[in-house]
């Protein structure tokens, strides 16, 4: 460089640009990490606010501390064992000696990062192992808080709590420790290999004393754990379902259980040999012991039990297995609450006679003609009033005392329809709640077939109550979230109810005054919930005031599941007006999967029926259980969302154990009001699980059970085109044979087990009812008869039609078909309602409402006919009374509810399509209603014309179609004229 020259100056861009580029990436990463952490924090923070507002913060804290504690403990145990194994292997590595080039390269690569690897690798594996253990927090909490069952198993005389609480925990613990030891062993083995503690060469494998002691101790610990596993296998035979029957059978008791004990002792002995070998350096004896252990496990644990089963049990299986089958029957019935089922032989007749129903007036007067799965659209058209309201697809059945008499009721809440509301402000601030309960008599309709409401309108009025809180802020169809409260008294923001003819000149508005959700008035809570719901509108809107609350997680099932995560919640909550407020009543279950000798059920499969298939009832989880109790009744206030849990089965050990985990969260049922008690009912999902078990476990004699020749099945729903789904149970008020009075009951029927060909007889074999009426009129006192199961067993020679056969009788009846075809004219649709089965008249009575729905968007079904079946006889009339009389010789002797059917005028209007046809209802059985030959000829002509019309339309021959329609019109006119002449 020449004198006077200056060194080149770096450009400003490069000088300033490189540091900026170098700092940009870490800055971006740091910002992203901070944002992610804050988003995660808001999820936890908003959960804390939600649980705290609801009064169940302890549940949130206890559950999360349990999960976090298990995760940390499991991760640390695995990491500590792996680190200790690595550290010991490195610390006791051989010094000096020959090292192969390959090993030297491994050591040179590992040494610079060895300390990091020895910490990081165990932590990574620990995190993976801990994630599995943490999901089992319920198993751990139940073990440490268990309550005894007070009953012992028939084999080991252990309290049943050992199998339900202790055994699952021990299995979890042993499985975790085995995993941790295997990871530690592999880690130590690799470290010994890399640093020369284990050398592989042509002469074989050589190990240092330190490596032998280290790895031998790990193998010994592994074998000791296997010994514990073998010992626990003895108890696990009582919950095994690997054979024909659940539980320890003859081979298990006499072969498997003894050999498992022998294997446990053998494994311990081999473990001791490995410890000794580690110190003395002689592996021959422990290796022989390990090989012998494998041989014994195969022979004694597999071949010997197989030989006992094949050559001793199979030839005389019934005699040898009888004792153990009886255990299975007894324990299964106990586990599912079937042990107190009252079985009554019922020699049902199929013969009819006049006055046969005179003794069943309490049953016939309560027969429900409104199908809650059909009339939802009728509720919507008659009571929805505005498009932003809706009713559920399936309504609910309850009962109310009206004028001192219990009335079965079809009931629903008028909830918001968020799909019809546009814009954030409207969705979140204005349209915040539904309004009112709508209820109709179950056993009567108006003269034109419409539901006869007992509670309806806006404002809500009726025979149930004129003075209750009608606002539905929490329901099955509520919006995702709403901002409520905080508005000035003179400037409310929430739409309360639409303009009506009751004096409201304009839409009424209101302000929520309850305590229903966390406060979002301060800026931090507002920011947290804006992030949670990804809404900038919430953050910027001036509609969010200092006193505003946010309502979310509003579905009753979801709220109960969150505050009681240990419960399985029934798929169908239902609303009731209780103590002048609307509450959702939610049934919840405690379950277990390791009740000894009890056969397992998969909840989702056992509860599957038409309603779950259609999505009108939530499906239960795909969980395998063998013990269930309806231990909790929960209520969710429809106005403020408050959740109350009541210990319905306060003797359930599983519930009592959970009460130890979450104290003061479940109240005794003695705190339930008389009004609430009156609306508690027997839960559907529990009943469906029980009836599924009764398909086999109605048999209580071991010999008969072994023969397996009396297996039942729940009939498929005959009203559905897809006949491969079970008929749902039905709520009915009726008097069972031998009882003094009618009770609100949940019912189902049984037919013989159906084979794949479908050729099995569809006849009635059994009829199950559960007393679903808990009310006594007193606070905190439930009826002694509530939950009582009664099973009517029909003779196996029964010719009483099952539901499928009864539906076929209805469908194949010529006169019924003719009238149904007439009802279908004018593009009307005929809808068969639920097929109800009732024990009455000394036999089984079938009743099915028939609805007609015209075409068009505003159409809804109305009752038009009632089908009745008894034996082979069918009645079909506008009224229930008329249909019963047709079956029972012209006078059934029954008393039916006022309005149990439609008027003759309405029936004529429906049948003729133009309001003129007055064809009397046919009487295919019993005492027939006389028809003139001219009238019958006209009906036959009409029927033929309809068939010709259908054929012409399918063929696309519109000329013949028009001719057939002309003949049909003339035939209908002739029929009306002839029928008028006979009156």
Curated annotation (Swiss-Prot):
Pfam families: UPF0182. Residues 947-959 have a biased composition (Basic and acidic residues). The chain crosses the membrane at residues 22-42, 67-87, 116-136, 172-192, 213-233, 261-281, 288-308. It is found in: Cell membrane. It is a multi-pass membrane protein. Keywords: Cell membrane, Membrane, Transmembrane, Transmembrane helix. GO terms for cellular component: extracellular region; plasma membrane. Residues 893-959 are annotated as: Disordered. Belongs to the UPF0182 family. This is UPF0182 protein KRH_08700. It comes from Kocuria rhizophila (strain ATCC 9341 / DSM 348 / NBRC 103217 / DC2201). The lineage of its organism: Bacteria, Bacillati, Actinomycetota, Actinomycetes, Micrococcales.
